[in-house]
Swiss-Prot record:
The presence of a 'disulfide through disulfide knot' structurally defines this protein as a knottin. It comes from the Eukaryota. This is U9-hexatoxin-Mg1a. Keywords: Amidation, Disulfide bond, Knottin, Secreted, Signal. It is found in: Secreted. Belongs to the neurotoxin 10 (Hwtx-1) family. GO terms for molecular function: ion channel inhibitor activity. The keyword RNA-binding does not apply. Residues 1-19 form the signal peptide. Its main location: secreted.
């Protein structure tokens, strides 16, 4: 009888552990999904971000400038330029 109770107790414990692992996995997937959704939505701003097409530096965000001669992309401001 004691062995049956021990086995039943272990089975219940195993079931609880499995259920908590499934909940933890769902929680991680929800966080990953939320991060991806936030990253994939376009930002609304008055300037163009890095590596976006531009024609003049005033179109690019602060800290970057348009390299229209070379690539036509907004890039980081380089020292000495």
């Amino acid at each position: 009888m004691k062995y049956v109770m021990v086995i039943l107790g272990l089975l219940v414990l195993a079931a609880i552990c499995c259920a908590s692992e499934v909940e933890e996995l769902d929680w991680r997937q929800e966080i990953a999904r939320a991060i991806l959704e936030a990253e994939l939505q376009p930002e609304e701003r008055d300037c163009k971000g890095l590596f976006r097409q531009c024609k003049k530096s005033s179109e690019c965000c602060k800290g970057s400038s348009c390299e229209s001669d070379l690539t036509g992309l907004c890039i980081f401001n380089l020292p000495g330029r």
